């Protein structure tokens, strides 16, 4: 009976029925055949509706959980000191990016363009930390790529699709999650074109990498080998659409301030209308970088097409001594708080005197390492103490002052007061 009802694909006289709703081929417009199974067009439409409803529910829950720009800024303030303008720019750009993803799920007439971000600022000013904090807040996969290791496909080095493989690794090869992740490409200024004139020799780690990154950043379907695999012809690839991945590129762009100043001076003209150049009134690098225009980035060595793919530009200021002292003490994961917790696990209190914090900040400024160099300085002055402390008894407090930082003196150890020994009872 069931055989008569389903029909045989080889017998043209048998009436075929949908395996899901039971309607015959005469009651529906289309009947699609599978391996001994049939499905009608009405059931296909019903399945589409169910999937569409589920996707809409997911989009609505994501919409309600997406933090507003003000909320994003509040979280960034907990981890990153200063850089208010850059944080506001990022908060708005990230919010708009994920709103754009939501709008793509609807049948909207207006298609929103993708707004990738370029962070310009000195070493240790907080570019990577900003990107990491954003990804943690939004609970999306995040990976960091070093632009200096990238080369064009076919040359020794990493090709640009390795970036997507790293992102997949962060989310256990869940393609759907990876397609809404964040990629931070560091040292992007190091792949600038070596000169404004085209070279006869191929620039495989400069302009060539910029060309290779264009499609990836704009949005393409990247073929990535599965877990731990290498590319070879007989292999099945994972297809990852990058159109919803947010790319944040960062770099120090050393010398860009001079390019901007040159443009400003050229705009001033010559003669009576010219702007007066004064060496005494030297602007801070951060303020100069804030005036960056796309033409400055092109003159620096980024190709016009690449600059066009990074429409949101946020500039970060060089950190001064007060800002570095705040970084040492104020953020949720401040360096001094981390070391205090380590010492507390040994039952010892750790104290940094104000003059010590100032000395650490001055040392980092002298080394031109920004906030990145703070931890190195603190690690080096506390290394011997952290080595000896677990073997010592009765230490209650360790004090770090300016002499420990400047003259490499040993930190002060304060010991617990020992109870006086009980007197022996005298015999009568």
From Swiss-Prot:
Residues 6-59 form the ClpX-type ZB domain. CDD domains: RecA-like_ClpX (cd19497). Zn(2+) binds at residues 18, 21, 40, 43. GO terms for biological process: cell division; proteolysis involved in protein catabolic process. InterPro entries: AAA+_ATPase, ATP-dep_Clp_protease_ClpX, ATPase_AAA_core, Clp_ATPase_C, Clp_protease_ATP-bd_su_ClpX, ClpX_bact, P-loop_NTPase, Znf_CppX_C4. Belongs to the ClpX chaperone family. Component of the ClpX-ClpP complex. Forms a hexameric ring that, in the presence of ATP, binds to fourteen ClpP subunits assembled into a disk-like structure with a central cavity, resembling the structure of eukaryotic proteasomes. It comes from Xanthomonas euvesicatoria pv. vesicatoria (strain 85-10) (Xanthomonas campestris pv. vesicatoria). It holds the Pfam family ClpB_D2-small. This is ATP-dependent Clp protease ATP-binding subunit ClpX.
């Amino acid at each position: 009976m069931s055989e008569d009802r389903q029909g045989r694909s080889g017998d043209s006289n048998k009436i075929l029925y949908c395996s899901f709703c039971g309607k015959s081929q005469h009651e529906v417009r289309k009947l699609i055949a599978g391996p001994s199974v049939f499905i009608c067009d009405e059931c296909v439409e019903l399945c589409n509706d169910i999937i569409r409803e589920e996707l809409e529910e997911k989009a609505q829950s994501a919409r309600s959980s997406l933090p507003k720009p003000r909320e994003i800024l509040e979280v960034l303030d907990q981890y990153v000191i200063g850089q208010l303008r850059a944080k506001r720019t990022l908060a708005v750009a990230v919010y708009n990016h994920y709103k754009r993803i939501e709008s793509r799920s609807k049948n909207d007439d207006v298609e929103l363009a993708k707004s990738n971000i370029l962070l310009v600022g000195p070493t240790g000013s907080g570019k990577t930390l900003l990107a990491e904090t954003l990804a943690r807040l939004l609970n999306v996969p995040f990976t960091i790529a070093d632009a200096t290791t990238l080369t064009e496909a076919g040359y020794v080095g990493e090709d640009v699709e390795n970036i997507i493989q790293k992102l997949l690794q962060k989310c256990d090869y869940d393609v759907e999650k990876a397609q809404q992740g964040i990629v931070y490409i560091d040292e992007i200024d190091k792949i600038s074109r070596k000169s404004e004139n085209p070279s006869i020799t191929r620039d495989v780690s400069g302009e060539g990498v910029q060309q290779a990154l264009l499609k990836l950043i704009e949005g393409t379907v990247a073929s990535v080998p599965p877990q731990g695999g290498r590319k070879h012809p007989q292999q099945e690839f994972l297809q990852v659409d990058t159109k919803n991945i947010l790319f944040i590129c960062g770099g120090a762009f050393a010398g860009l301030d001079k390019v901007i100043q040159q443009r400003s001076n050229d705009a001033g003209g010559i003669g009576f209308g010219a702007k007066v150049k004064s060496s005494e009134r030297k602007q801070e690098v951060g303020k100069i970088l804030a005036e960056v225009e796309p033409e400055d980035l092109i003159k620096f060595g980024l190709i016009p097409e690449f600059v066009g793919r990074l429409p949101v530009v946020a500039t970060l200021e060089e950190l001064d001594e007060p800002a570095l002292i705040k970084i040492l003490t104020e953020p949720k994961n401040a360096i001094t708080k981390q070391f205090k917790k380590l010492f507390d696990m040994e039952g010892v209190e750790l104290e940094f005197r104000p003059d010590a914090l100032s000395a650490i900040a001055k040392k980092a400024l002298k080394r031109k390492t920004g906030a990145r160099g703070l931890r190195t300085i603190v690690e080096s002055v506390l290394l011997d103490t952290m080595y000896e402390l677990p073997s010592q008894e009765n230490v209650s407090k360790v004090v770090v002052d300016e002499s420990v930082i400047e003259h490499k003196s040993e930190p002060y150890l304060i010991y617990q007061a020992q109870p006086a020994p009980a007197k022996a009872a005298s015999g009568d």
